[in-house]
């Protein structure tokens, strides 16, 4: 639990049942730790502030962690120079604080463009001096920010074309189709429906590799539902 996990780690034990842990602050700060902890149960953790701060050797797969309750990632990977693992599938819907999250994380350059940032209210210095990071963040929901946060990506590789579109929230879309078995023969006609979370002001286009490129979809009953 919260009162014993730090002591267990200090004693060299990481084979822990972490189900009761809700706070994971500072556990590996300024350490040489680099052991597998991808199996930890983080489903009840709400804060991971400074978790790997200055943990310059850590580079383990933690992409399977359930972080759906985590609200704060303040300085979680700050100066964790070696970390570059795929965490694209993390459920960040509860996240509110990304202050200095990847600050000085020199090697990190993973695709996190699909993260849900709709509840985030702090992104100051999130990628400050993250010298390798240059992923497309234009799909992030950043309606809580009227302008770029302070030092968001100063001295980082992130280009202006990959930065979030401040003050906007990209629409989400669900795709469904009429092909039940994923096998299409020459005589089959498959209908693909795109359902957006809001009405679209412009006509969406669809790309299917090897089949169609930027083909306009057809409006359905509302401007939020489109068909191809």
Feature locations, PLM:
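Negatively charged
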Residues: 1-170
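Non-catalytic beta-sheet/beta-sandwich ligand-binding modules that flank or precede catalytic cores
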Residues: 170-228
């Amino acid at each position: 639990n919260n009162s014993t996990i730090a002591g267990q780690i200090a004693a060299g034990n990481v084979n822990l049942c972490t189900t009761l842990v809700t706070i994971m602050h500072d556990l590996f700060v300024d350490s040489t730790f680099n052991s597998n902890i991808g199996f930890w149960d983080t489903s009840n953790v709400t804060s991971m502030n400074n978790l790997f701060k200055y943990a310059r050797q850590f580079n383990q797969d933690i992409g399977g962690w359930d972080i759906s309750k985590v609200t704060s990632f303040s300085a979680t990977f700050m100066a964790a120079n070696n970390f570059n693992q795929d965490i694209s599938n993390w459920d960040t819907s509860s996240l509110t604080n990304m202050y200095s999250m990847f600050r000085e994380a020199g090697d990190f350059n993973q695709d996190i463009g699909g993260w849900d940032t709709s509840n985030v209210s702090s992104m100051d210095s999130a990628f400050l001096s993250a010298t390798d990071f240059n992923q497309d963040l234009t799909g992030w929901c950043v309606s809580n920010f009227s302008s770029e946060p302070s030092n968001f990506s100063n001295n980082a590789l992130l280009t202006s074309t990959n930065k979030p579109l401040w003050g906007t929230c990209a629409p989400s879309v669900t795709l469904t189709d009429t092909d039940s078995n994923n096998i299409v023969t020459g005589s089959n006609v498959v209908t693909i429906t795109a359902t957006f979370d809001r009405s679209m002001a412009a006509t969406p286009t669809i790309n299917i590799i090897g089949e169609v490129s930027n083909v306009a979809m057809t409006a359905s009953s509302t401007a939020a539902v489109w068909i191809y």
